[in-house]
UniProtKB/Swiss-Prot annotation:
This is Imidazole glycerol phosphate synthase subunit HisF. Pfam families: His_biosynth. GO terms for cellular component: cytoplasm. CDD domains: HisF. It comes from Sulfurisphaera tokodaii (strain DSM 16993 / JCM 10545 / NBRC 100140 / 7). Pathway: Amino-acid biosynthesis; L-histidine biosynthesis; L-histidine from 5-phospho-alpha-D-ribose 1-diphosphate: step 5/9. The gene is hisF. GO terms for molecular function: imidazoleglycerol-phosphate synthase activity; lyase activity.
């Protein structure tokens, strides 16, 4: 059995780490290079950077941050946000990231998944799927959670696997930042539909939430609870081991 992964997520805006609730009301949480290094020391298995500005100025700042962070990390670094073209993918991997996360562009131009996967290997391509419940269905939203695509999330997960994604980063927008727990039903349905790893995201509030979701996902991602020190990664891993979830320590 493969060990489950604990992933620290850093939302980066203009070169700084920020955090909000349901994608809104952003507060400054510090320097990405420092935070990423700290999380690695604490035992995070991977780091995810999501660039939430994706403006031209923001992009330049991001590449600088990616380069500086990748140079100090030995754990995998995934970078997403505003990736629209194969050139974007190439630039981010070229600056030291191990994987890229593609979200809106994957929906609007499916070819990018296959092209990126063929060029850089499926292991480097993560497709991020942001989901809201609409009339009892799980629906894919893009453009930072603002645009209802009308696409069924379970069907989309199956499709991105076929197109060449190596991994799915699954975020519940309903749960994002609430600290009420992950969307277990959503995660379970997606995980049961695909053979590639699923990273659960959105809603971590206490250690039990990680335990619950790691029964149905390959990895659990969190941001706010780590930034605010509500949950310490070494304690979380001990807790999970005691509960019988295999994690790397």
């Amino acid at each position: 059995m493969t060990a489950k992964r604990i992933i620290a997520c850093l939302d980066v805006k203009n070169g700084r780490v920020v955090k909000g609730v349901n994608f809104l009301n952003l507060k400054d949480k510090g320097d990405p290079v420092e935070l990423a290094s700290r999380y690695e020391e604490e035992g995070a298995d991977e780091i995810v950077f999501l660039d939430i500005t994706a403006t031209i100025e923001g992009r330049k700042a991001l590449l600088e941050v990616v380069k500086n962070t990748a140079s100090v990390l030995s754990i995998p670094l995934t970078v997403g946000g505003g990736i629209r073209t194969i050139e974007d993918v190439s630039r981010i991997l070229g600056n030291g990231a191990d994987k890229v996360s593609i979200n809106t562009a994957a929906v609007e131009n499916k070819k990018i998944i296959t092209e990126a996967s063929e060029q850089f290997g499926a292991q480097a391509i993560v497709v991020a799927i942001d989901v809201k419940r609409v009339n009892n269905s799980f629906i894919v939203f893009t453009r930072s959670g603002t645009y209802n695509t009308g696409i069924d999330a379970i069907q989309w997960a199956k499709e991105v696997e076929k197109l060449g994604a190596g991994e799915i980063l699954l975020t519940s927008i309903d749960k994002d930042g609430t600290r009420e727990g992950y969307d277990i039903e959503l995660t379970k349905e997606v995980n049961n539909s695909v053979n590639i790893p699923v990273i659960a995201s959105g809603g971590a509030g206490k250690m039990e939430h990680f335990y619950e979701v790691l029964k149905v996902a390959d990895a659990a991602l969190a941001a706010g609870v780590f930034h605010d020190g509500v949950i310490k990664i070494p304690e979380l891993k001990r807790f999970l081991l005691e509960k019988g979830i295999e994690v790397r320590v």
